[in-house]
UniProtKB/Swiss-Prot annotation:
It comes from Shewanella sp. (strain MR-4). Pfam families: Anticodon_2, tRNA-synt_1c. Its cofactor is Zn(2+). Its main location: cytoplasm. This is Glutamate--tRNA ligase.
Length: 469
């Protein structure tokens, strides 16, 4: 049997990291077993579902690279199918119409609560004969009486629920709209889902869904209920712990590879290995290796992974993601070095692409002023001669190469009988406006000869004015 999994988010908000991890685990289960992955949008909550949220989910999945083989399917486009099955169940007697009023249901729950009993429907309409009436009704599933529902969860082992603890679930509301638990069952059946990976908050839904599947004569999929993600303080992950939207991590400068690597390790492991490519994940992933204990989100580890991928991935690929941040920070890259070359130069220093973009501005744009602190420290009177001499040597170069630039700077220090720092630091401030950059030779090479000479002239003028003031 072909493995077939699904990710089925509700479009009531963005794709958060918990949902992204569930999607990743489900995607990996399919890919590790040469199976298929389905994307399904569970939008039956019509009042809360929005197109914007749906678009955000698709954007997040695409950014992460979690491609789907089928879908996206939308539950709101399948109402005819759900109603067809409900009609069959009413005909077969596995479902019934319940005419109990809201007042009666509320009174029943209050009485059960007062008596310390579990709150559940009492089956008042379960065996009533059919009525020819215009009274409003819901449709309930006729849950089995007695016995239990047992399933082996890939993460939590054997789980058992007594049928007596389950009430007759509403599968269609008074307005005729089918309910979540029912739609899920029909979808999983129709789509041939063989393994359901989802959060632990769905465990209580599982016995209800299994009973409906049995009533329909449908196969029962395997289940894996993954634990929640906590903040570093042990509380449920929320906005106060930082970004929770997948696309917010994009905006903050993280690569999808870093986030995927981090998310897969939030509950799953393979020995002591920390860094996993997507291909390695597909080869090694097993649902049975997921830990059932909650995982704590640690931003420092994510930053470390992001640095690793910025440094080790193909610079052209990193540049393709960096371009978004250059555009976001309004840095025009059309007049300057190849962005991949800038990635190579700055990768060792950057924690995020957002930082990398900000620190690369001087490669593409002239700056209005020097950093005040660095200028005070390095653009002093003693810097005038080194700047003038290095400008002459750089201007004389017939080939603008990293090696030639390095030799020109070195020759300046040798001729003036000073350390490289006496030449290098004023020169760095002159061409970048700041006190930090990659090696001066590669920095000047990427800035370009004309622009470098112009900036050195500006620094010489700045120092001369300072001497004369």
């Amino acid at each position: 049997m072909t493995t077939k999994t699904r990710f089925a988010p509700s479009p009531t908000g963005f794709l958060h990291v918990g949902g992204a991890r569930t999607a990743l685990y489900s995607w990996l289960q399919a890919r590790a077993n040469n199976g298929e992955f389905v994307l399904r949008i569970e939008d039956t909550d019509i009042e809360r579902s929005t197109q914007a949220a749906c678009d955000a989910i698709l954007e997040g999945m695409n950014w992460l690279g979690l491609t789907w083989d089928e879908g996206p399917y939308y539950q709101t486009k399948r109402f005819d199918r759900y109603n067809e099955i409900i009609a069959q169940m009413l005909e077969q007697g596995t479902a019934y119409k319940c005419y109990c009023s809201r007042e009666r249901i509320d009174a029943l729950r209050e009485a059960q609560a007062a008596n310390g009993e579990a709150q559940k429907y009492d089956g008042c309409c379960r065996d009533l004969p059919a009525r020819d009436t215009d009274e409003p009704f819901v449709v309930r599933f006729k849950n089995p009486i007695g016995g239990s529902v047992v399933f082996d969860d890939h993460v939590r082992g054997r789980i058992e629920f007594s049928n007596d603890a389950l009430d007759d679930l509403i599968i269609a509301r008074t307005d005729g709209v089918p309910t979540y638990n029912f739609c899920v069952v029909v979808d999983d059946w129709d789509m041939g889902i063989t393994c359901v990976v989802r959060g632990e908050d769905h465990i209580n839904n599982t016995p209800r869904q299994i009973n409906i599947l049995k009533a329909l004569g449908a196969p029962i999929p395997e289940y894996a209920h993954v634990s929640m993600i906590l903040g570093d303080d042990g509380a449920k992950l929320s906005k106060r712990h930082g970004a929770v939207s997948v696309m917010q991590y994009r905006d903050d400068g993280y690569l999808p590879e870093a986030l995927l690597n981090y998310l897969v390790r939030l509950g799953w492991s393979h020995g002591d290995q920390e860094v996993f490519s997507l291909e390695e994940m597909k080869q090694l992933f097993k649902l049975d290796d997921i830990n059932k204990a909650p995982s704590a989100f640690n931003t420092e580890k994510l930053v470390w992974l992001n640095q690793h991928y910025i440094k080790t991935l193909d610079p052209e690929y990193v540049a393709s993601h960096l371009q978004w941040h250059m555009d976001d920070q309004k840095i025009d890259t059309s007049n300057g070095p190849a962005l991949s070359a800038v990635v190579t130069a700055l990768a060792e220093r950057a924690k995020t692409l957002k930082e990398l973009a900000a620190s690369s501005r001087y490669f593409y744009e002239d700056f209005a002023e020097f950093d005040a602190e660095q200028a005070k420290k390095h653009l002093r009177g003693v810097a005038l001669e080194p700047l003038q001499l290095v400008q002459q040597k750089l201007a004389a170069l017939t080939e603008w190469t990293v090696e030639a630039i390095h030799q020109a700077i070195e020759a300046t220090a040798t001729e003036l009988e000073v350390g490289m720092g006496k030449v290098g630091m004023p020169l760095r401030v002159a061409v970048t406006g700041a006190g930090q950059s990659p090696g001066l030779d590669i920095t000047l090479f990427l800035i370009g000869k004309v622009r470098s000479e112009q900036r050195i002239s500006k620094a010489i003028e700045f120092v001369a004015d300072r001497i004369n003031s």
